[in-house]
């Protein structure tokens, strides 16, 4: 069942098929003749895998069937992380790691390689990093103010979630639902923080942009 509340199932099915074709063509081109600009290839692969994960989740695909796309993001991002990792991408990458933490042995080396190359970070990313790498929960403060609002209750999450979309007005995907590049809006970071804090209230599934199925998987 489709999860997105803005576009149609047909829209996302067509988008998923398109991005799948783009990914396959990039893989085939790479296998035939390694491109001269390898860094550019890896950057495009990161985007391809990100697109498929987000569109696939919006479409309603199973969260475990999307896991290989997360692995694809990491395996390519680690090759270009030394150039810098955009902040919102870093937040998504680490929050998805928390949401898939039951399978972290399958991706932790790549995630660590990315983290080691990052020249700046944030309290939220450190929060996720410590949870994933050291199985510890530590206090944090983030430049994402809505994250600082989350306590140990559903009510605090609901209040924070009201600010999630508008807090990303400088993100490249902001307002994309008015274009044909829309892939869905999903607050992976809010769900990841809920997981660490142990907030699994069923009312979360009714919050706009909240990826509930990723939170309660398995």
Stretches with model-predicted labels:
Residues 155-218:
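Alpha-helical oligomerization segments
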Residues 1-178, 182:
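Eukaryote-skewed repeat-based solenoidal scaffolds used as protein-protein interaction platforms
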